[in-house]
Amino acid sequence: MPVSVKNSEVLFAALKSAGITLLSALPETWLVHVMQMAESDPDITLIRLNKEEEGVGISAGAHLAGRKSAMLMQNHGLLTSVNGIVSVAQLYRIPLLMVISYRGEMGERDPWQTEGGRITEPLLQSLGIIYRKLSDPATVAYEVRQAQTLAESSLRPVALLLTRDLMWEE
């Protein structure tokens, strides 16, 4: 199963349309095309991370500098970022758009991804983070805009979960 280039293009265009000019990411299979597009786009700064939690600080700095940013990560990266999300983004009211590949849900073929998938939504709920699951490319631009608007108006983290139906071509 290859990652959908077409839907990656839809997602990248939606991020740009929402005014995102800075992306932070660790290499991630489902987001590889989005990262490649960011690297080749002169209007976007892509910062490669050593661990996902660093992206919280980068997004905080971007916000303080007047730039809109988003973190690209897998849901296991969300798990490792909880301390930064709570201690920086929530405590200091930083608008944080998290674009998360949602591994471990229905149809997952990799057993090592299933536990992270099982706890992703309950974790977001326990942190009070509003999220949406994206599966239809026709709604991606709308959902990205809505999520960015909410992050900015609430000064809180917001998450978009990218499903297998959106990111993979069967």
Pin down the residues of each PLM region.
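Thiamine diphosphate
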Residues: M1-E170
